[in-house]
Amino acid sequence: RYTDNEIADRWFSDMYAAETCINRYFNGRLMPQFPFEAMTSAALNVGCTDLWWNKKERHFTQIYREAQAQHWPAMCHRLPDFRYSAGKPVLLPRRLREEAWCLQH
């Protein structure tokens, strides 16, 4: 069992890693606030590498490409691409909420 301080430390560390990922790989420093927050949420849930690299097809993801081009609305619309866990689209409600949040910019 974790203490409250251990939970807080892990949360801080995980959030910092997700924000660093978005800044490093997705032009996060140039991104409007709402897209940055939505992408950070996705990175926290999906993992940094899986958000920018398609391991199965061995190429950059479309969401990564849109971020590189600073096409923020197009990037936001790619969030639902990451809806699967264990082969089932159980993450779709979360991704749709992130997409809606992202598009508020």
Regions found by a protein language model. Give the residues of each.
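Acidic/histidine-rich, surface-exposed loop or edge segments in extracytoplasmic proteins
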Residues: 1-4
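Long, amphipathic alpha-helical surface segments
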Residues: 6-13, 19, 48-105
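Active-site nucleophile-His-acid catalytic modules used for acyl/amide transfer and hydrolysis
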Residues: 17-57
